[in-house]
Design a protein with these regions (language model features):
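Alpha-helical segment proximal to the catalytic Tyr-Lys
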Residues: 124, 169-173
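Conserved glycine-rich Rossmann-like NAD(P)H-binding loop of the short-chain dehydrogenase/reductase
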Residues: 27-41
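Substrate-binding pocket helix/loop in short-chain dehydrogenase/reductase
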Residues: 95-96, 100-108
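Active-site helix of classical SDR
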Residues: 119, 156, 164
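Active-site loop immediately N-terminal to the catalytic Tyr-X3-Lys motif
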Residues: 97, 145-151, 173-174
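Conserved glycine-rich cofactor-binding loop
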Residues: 11-12
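Residue(s) in the substrate-gating loop at a strand-loop-helix junction
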Residues: 140
Length: 187
């Protein structure tokens, strides 16, 4: 039986590239999208053409209950995930004095709360597998050094980095690793 990896935000961009690369490496993939279902289905089809299994889950990672319901139903139907790539995220860039409450809230809810909302419901099923597992958080250089016009985004990514470090300590004895990848600007 092949191991399955959930890749959030994998209908396009970095997430799509990660999902395809993991499929090429022999993993089955759960393709996730918030709204781009057609693009997510195309990614899933590309994965199937590589000889791997793929399915699509659609939910907004900033909505805790919806995220938990979708993930728990998927785990119930298909079993616990071997790994998760937390890639879903967004930016709402603006100089801090011009940053709106909504700009702050939506970025923190999606990026930082999304970490909790995705991982919390699937953590015990991953632990109960009693096998090694992997969690990779796609963060940003902005979470390490900050970036002009991205106070909200930098705060969210720095929060993920801190949470990932703490979770890595918690899960180390269970052979589940937690790491962050912090890219710079992406084309």
């Amino acid at each position: 039986m092949s191991e399955t990896i959930l890749v959030t935000g994998s209908s396009r961009g970095i997430g799509k590239a990660i999902a395809l690369r993991l499929a090429q490496s022999g993993f089955d993939i759960v393709v996730h999208c918030r709204s781009r279902i057609e693009e997510a289905e195309e990614v899933a089809q590309s994965i199937r053409e590589l000889g791997r299994q793929a399915r699509v889950l659609q939910f907004d990672v900033s909505h805790r209950n919806e995220t938990a319901e979708k993930l728990l139903a998927d785990v119930e139907s298909h079993g616990a995930y071997y790994g998760v790539v937390l890639n879903a995220g967004l930016t709402r860039d603006n100089a801090f004095p011009a940053l709106t409450d909504e700009d702050w809230d939506v970025v923190l809810r999606t990026n930082l709360d999304g970490f909790y909302n995705v991982l919390h419901p699937i953590m015990m099923p991953m632990i109960r597998r009693r096998k090694a597992g992997r969690i990779v958080c796609i963060t940003s250089v902005s979470g390490l050094i900050g970036n002009r016009g991205q106070v909200n985004y930098s705060a969210s990514k720095a929060g993920i980095i801190g949470a990932a470090k703490a979770l890595a300590v918690e899960l180390a004895k269970r052979k589940i690793t937690v790491n962050c990848v912090a890219p710079g600007l992406i084309d």
